[in-house]
Design a protein with these regions (language model features):
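HhH-family (HhH-GPD) DNA N-glycosylase catalytic core used in base-excision repair
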Residues: 151, 155-158, 164, 194, ...
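Residue-level signature of tetratricopeptide-repeat
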Residues: 364-365
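Short amphipathic alpha-helical boundary/capping segments
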Residues: 347-351
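C-terminal extensions
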Residues: 316-346, 372-449
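Conserved Radical SAM active-site core
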Residues: 1-233, 237-241, 254, 272, ...
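A structural motif corresponding to the C-terminal lobe/cap of the Radical SAM core domain
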Residues: 93-94, 99, 103-112, 238-323
Length: 449
């Protein structure tokens, strides 16, 4: 491993040559958590104070280290993270017996409380909250204006969100969501089908008890806020038999209870072929990892909840369709959506419409009526959206609002979609198509070159 001096030298040499813009600093445990964290803090302090390094620093906190060392690192780093590793306690005991939920969640809670105290002291209104906080805040304001139902009328207000002061307000539990109890209104630990305990709700709060506050305000020779870029965590996917539903429920609880900026997902790869580690029957679950990232964005930016995307009866994502399309196909009664009148949150739930394109639609339709060509220019992915929207009461072309029909078109390997009742269709020509048309191109088929 590198010494603190070597880390400083390498970082500054790369930084001066404009090879890097920041540093990601992590370490395995050497001798003890405290000794390792001391070395990390020394490297961070030397970079900031001695070398005047002003670049971005993401630092890994070592579970089990002294709270004072965790706080010291937070004053010098932009972002900190503590890996949750696995969503179930049993999986953690089996694959990482040297770690416990308490040693992981306690420093996570300490960092959260320190961030809230720093925000309040510095008067940061927006602060370093994650996207999930602002999405839920917007959602609560909208629901308060409209009543108890959401934009689609699918479920009532039932979740607590983080307030501007950093305090949490919790309402009733939601029926069908792991870790909640609709009768008592309290969050509790849930159990997977295999008997594993899933970390959610009150269990997270109980394991991560609040610290007594920041103690090193004037001791670190820095005017930076405490962890100004927020904190994140990571989970390993496919190592302990957890379902996507369990993983997303844990991620949602972490966003809500610990103000995380991001939850990262890493497909399990058995590198050293250790017999104590699970053996993979196939390739690493990279597509599953991709679907989890897509669903994570739906939680943070689009206002979805874990129990909307998955359920105990359908615990895993569709590998052929992205989670948003899969959700829309299960709720065809809510479509098509009229582009000219739909509000922002309704537009966000349409496949093919993202955050930027939804905002552009709202801005553009104030001055003109939108056509499908306009939507394409605004960034809407018509390949997916065309089945779920209308412009001025008309669809782009006559199509069936049927699940099987839409799935066939969305999963066609050649992406052939008919764009008119005259039979005209489009597809991308490849470099190897020269000899594929001995009789020439058919009149009803147009190739895009």
């Amino acid at each position: 491993s590198f010494t603190p001096e070597e880390i400083c030298t390498l970082t500054m040499e790369f930084y001066r040559r404009n090879y890097i813009e920041g540093l990601f600093l992590s370490s395995g445990i050497l001798h003890s958590p405290n000794e390792t964290m001391e070395q990390i803090c020394k490297a961070l302090r030397d970079l900031r104070i001695i070398h005047r390094f002003n670049g971005y620093i993401h630092c890994k906190a070592i579970p089990g280290a002294d709270p004072a060392l965790i706080e010291m690192a937070g004053w010098y780093a932009d972002r900190m993270s503590i890996n949750l590793e696995l969503p179930t306690e049993e999986g953690l005991k089996r694959l990482a017996p040297n770690k416990t939920r308490k040693t992981i969640l306690t420093p996570m809670r300490q960092i959260q409380n320190g961030m809230a105290e720093s925000r309040e002291y510095l008067g940061m209104k927006g602060g370093n909250y994650g996207a999930y906080h602002f999405t839920q805040e917007r959602k609560q304001k909208r629901l308060a204006m409209r009543g108890a139902k959401d934009a689609f009328g699918t479920h009532a207000i039932s979740r607590g969100v983080t307030s501007a002061s950093g305090a949490h307000t919790v309402s009733r539990g939601v029926k069908g969501v792991p870790g909640t109890n609709a009768d008592t209104g309290g969050y509790k630990i849930s159990h997977s089908g295999s008997g594993d305990s899933v970390i959610t709700g009150t269990d997270l709060m109980r394991q991560g008890k609040a610290s007594s506050g920041l103690q090193l305000w004037n001791s670190c020779d820095t005017k930076r806020g405490f962890v100004p870029a927020g904190q994140s965590t990571q989970m390993i996917i496919g190592a302990s038999g957890e379902t996507d539903y369990e993983i997303m429920a844990v991620s949602e609880a972490l966003y809500r209870r610990f103000d995380l900026k991001r939850v990262f997902y890493s497909a399990f790869i058995n590198v050293n072929k250790d017999s104590t580690l699970p053996a993979l029957d196939s390739q690493p679950p990279l597509r599953r990892e991709h679907r989890l990232y897509q669903a994570d964005f739906l939680l943070r930016y689009y206002g979805f909840e874990a129990n909307e995307l998955l359920s105990p009866s359908r615990p895993n994502f569709n590998t052929y369709l992205d989670p948003k399309c899969d959700w829309a196909l299960g709720h065809l009664e809510l479509f098509p959506v009229e582009i000219e009148s739909a509000d922002y949150d309704t537009l966000l739930r349409v496949p093919g419409i993202g955050v930027k394109s939804a905002r552009r639609i709202l801005a553009a339709r104030r001055s003109t009526k939108l056509t499908f060509q306009d939507l394409k220019k605004l960034g809407v992915v018509l390949k997916r959206a065309v089945y779920f929207i209308t412009c001025s009461g008309r669809m782009m072309y006559p199509t069936k609002l049927e699940e099987d029909y839409i799935v066939r078109n969305l999963t066609d390997p050649k992406d052939r979609i008919r764009f008119g009742s005259d039979g005209m269709s489009y597809r991308q020509m490849t470099l190897f198509d020269d000899g594929m048309f001995p009789n020439g191109v058919r009149q009803e088929e147009k190739l895009i070159i």
